[in-house]
Regions:
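Cytosolic regulatory regions built on CNB/CRP/Popeye-like sensor folds
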Residues: 1-132
Length: 132
């Protein structure tokens, strides 16, 4: 099932022009987003982590851990985003297993990507922990 099927209701869809900041690192995270149209770039500081394409999600981490945003999101192109607040997010996680699995998959993919980046960086080569 595609996320766009879960979010067929466009009442909470919001347009963003290319170059518009959707959220910034350090912001309080009270919503997550599903890309309906267009593309969104995710940055950690000045590092480009990924480009989220239609049917992709972002901003979910702050809904789970209640911490501030660790990344910034900027509209790469003109885009339309489905906004999901905390109440709706919790409902979907509980009532729609496909949605819950999709969120876990996105988080796992991002964790793997960051793990690979750390392993390839100087940090990954110089901080291996205690040596026997």
């Amino acid at each position: 099932m595609r996320l766009s099927n879960i979010f067929a209701d466009t009442s909470k869809a919001r347009p963003f022009a290319a170059g518009t900041s959707i959220f910034e690192k350090g912001d309080k995270g009270e919503e997550m987003y599903v890309v309906k149209e267009g593309e969104v770039d995710i940055f950690i500081n000045d590092f480009h982590l990924e480009t989220v394409i239609p049917d992709g999600i972002f901003g979910e981490l702050s809904l789970i851990d209640r911490e501030t945003r660790i990344a910034s999101a900027i509209a790469r192109t003109d885009c339309t985003l489905q906004v999901v607040d905390k109440r709706r997010f919790l409902f979907l996680i509980q009532e729609t297993p496909v949605f819950a699995i999709q969120v876990m998959k996105v988080m796992a993919d991002r964790l793997r990507r960051v793990d690979l980046l750390i392993a390839k960086s100087d940090f990954g080569r110089t901080n291996r922990g205690p040596q026997n």
